[in-house]
UniProtKB/Swiss-Prot annotation:
The chain crosses the membrane at residues 13-36, 56-71, 83-108, 184-205. PANTHER family: TETRASPANIN. PROSITE patterns: TM4_1. It is a multi-pass membrane protein. Gene3D superfamilies: Tetraspanin (1.10.1450.10). Keywords: Glycoprotein, Membrane, Transmembrane, Transmembrane helix. It is found in: Membrane. Belongs to the tetraspanin (TM4SF) family. This is 23 kDa integral membrane protein. Its main location: membrane. SUPFAM superfamilies: Tetraspanin. Residues 37-55, 109-183 are extracellular.
Amino acid sequence: MATLGTGMRCLKSCVFVLNIICLLCSLVLIGAGAYVEVKFSQYGDNLHKVWQAAPIAIIVVGVIILIVSFLGCCGAIKENVCMLYMYAFFLVVLLIAELAAAIVAVVYKDRIDSEIDALMTGALDKPTKEITEFMNLIQSSFHCCGAKGPDDYRGNVPASCKEENLTYTEGCVSVFGAFLKRNLVIVACVAFGVCFFQLLSIVIACCLGRQIKEYENV
């Protein structure tokens, strides 16, 4: 096989560098997924079950990107055409999945308030020890009261709705919903950022694979 030219060595270096970036992004995704998982679990099993799939999916995607990025690094270092094309194929599949997930996350954020409202209204209508602890934690953490306001308690406002004898006036649906939306947007932005680097990696990996194949036939 002939020696790769300067341009192809640059492509090889680009593939390697982009994969290192994707690898770091995958670690960020795994960390973000773990953080969201822990955060959601702090607010009780009722909330955790509703959004449990989201952080787990983020962690799984992060692990897959980690493995695929490693494959890309090996393909670039070894100048292996088969590994580079496999790497590009897996990246295309991941790219489509991530774009779909990011779009769904952005669209889904408009439904958060209605789902939180249904969850909290149902919790206040049929209070149990677990649900009461869940509401108390939300109220004390986010300085809110009830689903839509302190009137939800019909005059029997719990201590978690107060601070120095002042009752929180905002409902938890709007306050907690805004918290979830912010985190959802952050996750979507990270996903779009990862997709950008993956798209570059796909193009450069295919170019490198084609050029290596041409050099092998010289």
